[in-house]
Amino acid sequence: MKLFYFFLLSFLSSYIIAFSFKSTQSAHFILSVGRCNENYGNNIKKNRLYSTNNDHLKLLKYVREVTNASIQLCNKALKECNNDVDKAIEHVRKNTKSSTFVSTNIKVKKEGLVASQIKDDKIVLLELLTDSDFVARNKMFVQFVYSLLNVTLDNDLSVGNCKNAGDNKNSEDGYTTSGNILSNNNIMDEILSLPYVDEENKSNSTMREQLNYLRNIFREDIKIGRFSKYSKKNPNEFLHYYIHNKLDDHVGLSGVLLVLHINNLDEILKTKKEDIVNFANDLSMHIISAKPASVSIDTLNPKITKKEMDIIRDGLKDMKKPENILNNMIQGKMKKFYSSIVFLEQEYMLDETKRKVSQVIKDFGKDHNINISVNHFNYFAIGEKNVLME
């Protein structure tokens, strides 16, 4: 029996020694791998072209998306401009062969819904934002969007004469609230102080209280995004909205608010309403595809025009050409710029005739014997931001 215990003790001792050796070797191996990874990471950091700071990467992506320049050029421009995005974009465009915008719209990481509705002589287009598509499709979220539509249509907002890049000068009297105005805290407070009306048409709280309730339930950053309201003052103004990627008739992922001016509107609608609605839908689909920043050259923000002209002029400053030739080159580039961002100057995207939108509108008026023009539009799309207008 003593002999059995002796062999058992010897076996256990040998096993413990072997296991200790194996663990020590594993520990040494893990430590070596860790050191290799650390050295590799340090080498990567030394050779990296740009900072890993999240904010810097967002700025870098933004500049690259607008200009389509290389990462190196965009990163260099951001450094030289102290991370000022607007100046960095200008810097890149002045120092590359192509000074034209690649895109005026960039992607942003936001989910939500766009909604629009007409009531009496008023029309509203708005967006409600959140962090996930799951919440955006929730019944309570959609109901809050509808309540927003109803209360903003039923209540006058004390904003005054505010103009947007999408306005036509002739529409100033009818213009109540611009899509870019919501950054004003007073307007936000005014909307959120309005009563919240539920599905049963009952009101027991304010819009702010209901918004906070939804935030607490879903644990997401739910907020009102862009907002536009247009009040019809001229009897010849035709109000129209178009929702793309619909959840239903009033709610979807993008939308257009459109105001047309048609002489003798009431009489025209008696016989040609369907034609006008279909044409308004076509114009709206063009706006969604082409993403213009203004109705006409005259209504484009003068700051945008001046800024673009300065960029073009700086890009041509090293060319040894007579002044008149340089001016012609500048005008040619400006014409190309206008054709990319001005609604009436754009090439119509719904057919292959290569007509300007302005010509398409004239042809429609001629074919239907009506005098028609575009006064105003707003365009909102979830996950998109216009770099010229916002």
From Swiss-Prot:
This is Elongation factor Ts, mitochondrial. GO terms for biological process: mitochondrial translational elongation; translational elongation. CDD domains: UBA_EF-Ts. Coiled coil: none annotated. It is found in: Mitochondrion. Its main location: mitochondrion. One of its GO terms (molecular function) is translation elongation factor activity. Belongs to the EF-Ts family. Associates with the EF-Tu.GDP complex and induces the exchange of GDP to GTP. It remains bound to the aminoacyl-tRNA.EF-Tu.GTP complex up to the GTP hydrolysis stage on the ribosome. It comes from Plasmodium falciparum (isolate 3D7). Keywords: Elongation factor, Mitochondrion, Protein biosynthesis. GO terms for cellular component: apicoplast; mitochondrion.
